[in-house]
Swiss-Prot record:
Belongs to the venom Kunitz-type family. It comes from the Eukaryota. Shows weak binding and inhibition of MMP-2 and shows an activity in inhibiting migration and invasion of neuroblastoma. It comes from Bungarus multicinctus. Negative results: does not inhibit chymotrypsin and trypsin. Does not inhibit vasopressin V2 receptor (V2R/AVPR2). InterPro entries: Kunitz_BPTI, Kunitz_BPTI_sf, Prtase_inh_Kunz-CS, TFPI/VKTCI-like. Keywords: Disulfide bond, Metalloenzyme inhibitor, Metalloprotease inhibitor, Protease inhibitor, Secreted, Signal. This is Kunitz-type serine protease inhibitor PILP-2.
């Protein structure tokens, strides 16, 4: 197969992976929790998984408490809940 064909195949595979939804059976249950800012008053940038658009979104975290649907980075959220 030519390098152009391999590049096209790689592109199509990447597109397929992006468009294929993650099965909710493989997603931890806490990914379905609503974002919980916690009981403290700090304003920390955090991310949570939103099951409606099936993606990780930013929310203001208070710095303590909250629930498990709370991630420091969007990459961590995506690895855990979005696939």
């Amino acid at each position: 197969m030519s390098s152009g064909g391999l590049l096209l195949l790689l592109g199509l595979l990447t597109l397929w992976m992006e468009l294929t939804p993650v099965s909710s059976k493989n997603r931890p249950p806490f990914c379905n929790l609503l974002p919980e800012p916690g009981r403290c008053n700090a304003i920390v940038r955090a991310f949570y998984y939103n099951s409606r658009p099936r993606k990780c979104l930013e929310f203001p975290y208070g710095g303590c408490g909250g629930n498990a649907n709370n991630f420091k980075t969007i990459e961590e959220c995506q690895r855990t809940c979005a696939g």
